[in-house]
Amino acid sequence: MANRKYFGTDGVRGKVGAYPITPDFALKLGWAAGKVLSSQGSKMVLIGKDTRISGYMLESALEAGLAAAGLSAAFTGPMPTPAIAYLTRTFRAEAGIVISASHNPYYDNGIKFFSAKGTKLPDEIEEAIEAMLEQPMDCVESAELGKASRINDAAGRYIEFCKGTFPAHLGLEGYKIVIDCANGATYHIAPNVFRELGAEVIEIGTDPNGLNINEKCGATDVTALQAKVVETKADVGLAYDGDGDRIMMVDHLGNKVDGDQILFIIAREALRSGQLKGGVVGTLMSNMSLEIALKMLGVPFLRANVGDRYVLEKMLENDWTLGGENSGHIIIADKNTTGDGIVASLAVLAAMAQHKLSLNELASAVKLFPQVLINVRFAGGENPLESDAVKSVAAEVEKRLEGKGRILLRKSGTEPLIRVMVECQDAELAQQCAEEIAEAVKKIN
């Protein structure tokens, strides 16, 4: 990934109107991807997007580039990222493209690709696309140009897929569920999934206008969801991010249940039913309490680098089927090929219904250690993490923690940030240590 010019850990991403998230680059990217992907197969690429206003501009440019390379485009309209992964497989498309910046504000956007198998593109394919971007753009003969079409039943297909992951002998009758769709791609999907399974659904964050995606709502800000769950005396709250590949939950008392706790609930239920294959993959950011709780069940646990693509890579390396991040990316590989917020939340609801336990009771096995995360904007130049001054402060902090906690310093793969994380059973000590390291990073920056 270090030598990439455009592709980060989750495709190409940035501020709309600033290179490379511009219409001219999207046109060239569509063409370059089309040239690389057109060697065989259906000659058709699915294009989905979230609800950002810039999605219209970018999908048109991508379609024109693909057509010039001889590939046809099939538009799904606003659709969760995991839906595109699923639909790419079922339509036997050459590839799938998602126009989204996930949990970022509306003024950011991104373009990411799925292979014909519904997985992130291999590194060598992304590298080939980057190499093609350096070539002058051409156009196939008129008779070979791609066409554009629309898939009108994409939402219905994905709704049925999601419902099919829920055990047939269970239902959600009697459950009151608040669903926050972040004014994003799940707004017309998630409420219907849970209603059709029998639940009473209360919606928030389901009125997208192109500018309000992830704005004080969704998986990155569950404050409104917590208030609505308590106000309506709901059994559970579900919060998805803008493109629907993350899930955060809220119990009936208004407590947040994060990705680590969700991952544990799903793992324990899979273990009980004999469906857990191998162990569980987390990340360097996974809370120590998750690892301890899984160890008590005898479940192996491995840490991958941060990013769902790295979680999936380690799952595939070990032939395991469950992994995720504390941010709410949960991959259940025997159900979908990427993080799927709706499918993951259905797995938790199935455990609640099966054992007649509340989310609070299910999540109580994982008592999260306080974790302090400080993001320091990185302007370029020397990487502060390579600085002797930062290394010295980090080493002193590690010594002070004396096995009671841990630190993690990393450069973001999707944003110009240095992430400082300190985890410790003593919350005050964690905060103090994180601030000391962040201050050292700022001085270098």
Curated annotation (Swiss-Prot):
GO terms for cellular component: cytosol. Activated by phosphorylation. GO terms for biological process: carbohydrate metabolic process; peptidoglycan biosynthetic process; UDP-N-acetylglucosamine biosynthetic process. It comes from the Bacteria. One of its GO terms (molecular function) is magnesium ion binding. It holds the Pfam family PGM_PMM_III. Mg(2+) binds at residues 102, 241, 243, 245. Its EC number is 5.4.2.10. Keywords: Isomerase, Magnesium, Metal-binding, Phosphoprotein. It catalyses: alpha-D-glucosamine 1-phosphate = D-glucosamine 6-phosphate. Gene3D superfamilies: Alpha-D-Glucose-1,6-Bisphosphate, subunit A, domain 3, Alpha-D-phosphohexomutase, C-terminal domain. It is an enzyme of class 5 (isomerase). The active site is at residue 102. The modification Phosphoserine is found at residue 102. Binds 1 Mg(2+) ion per subunit. Its cofactor is Mg(2+). Belongs to the phosphohexose mutase family. Catalyzes the conversion of glucosamine-6-phosphate to glucosamine-1-phosphate. HAMAP family: GlmM_B. This is Phosphoglucosamine mutase. It comes from Haemophilus influenzae (strain PittEE). The lineage of its organism: Bacteria, Pseudomonadati, Pseudomonadota, Gammaproteobacteria, Pasteurellales. The gene is glmM.
